A protein has these predicted regions:
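Compact, glycine-rich, soluble single-domain proteins
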Residues: 9-45, 49, 53-54
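Aromatic side chains
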Residues: 6, 29, 81-82
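Conserved beta-strand segments that form the floor/walls of ligand-binding pockets within enzyme
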Residues: 7, 44, 63-65
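Short amphipathic
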Residues: 1-10
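C-terminal structural segments of small proteins and small subunits
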Residues: 53-86
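Residues at or immediately flanking beta-strands
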Residues: 5, 33-35, 61-63
């Protein structure tokens, strides 16, 4: 398993538009299970509504974990997405 921590910098946090794009990005990696954890609650990043229910706001620290095929590459790609969009 590979993981990284990230502090959300988007002024409105993870809202509908970036959440939808994030889910779409994660769908490219069907061989991996990608989860996001905030405040002790974890969600599969293929589940848009579960992600939205976490209520991630600017300044929150989240942990993204990747398990499965080519963890290093998938983790790096998702981390780059976070840096560019969140």
């Amino acid at each position: 398993m590979k993981s990284f921590d990230y502090v959300i910098t988007d002024p409105v946090g993870i809202h509908a538009r970036p959440a939808g794009i994030l889910v779409k990005e994660v769908k490219n990696y069907r061989d991996s299970v990608v989860t996001l954890t905030r405040g002790g609650k974890s969600v599969n990043l293929l589940k848009l509504m579960a992600l939205m229910q976490l209520g991630v706001k600017q300044g929150d620290t989240v942990t993204v974990s990747v398990e499965g095929g080519d963890e290093e590459a998938v983790c790096a790609a998702i981390e780059n997405f976070f840096k560019a969009n969140l």
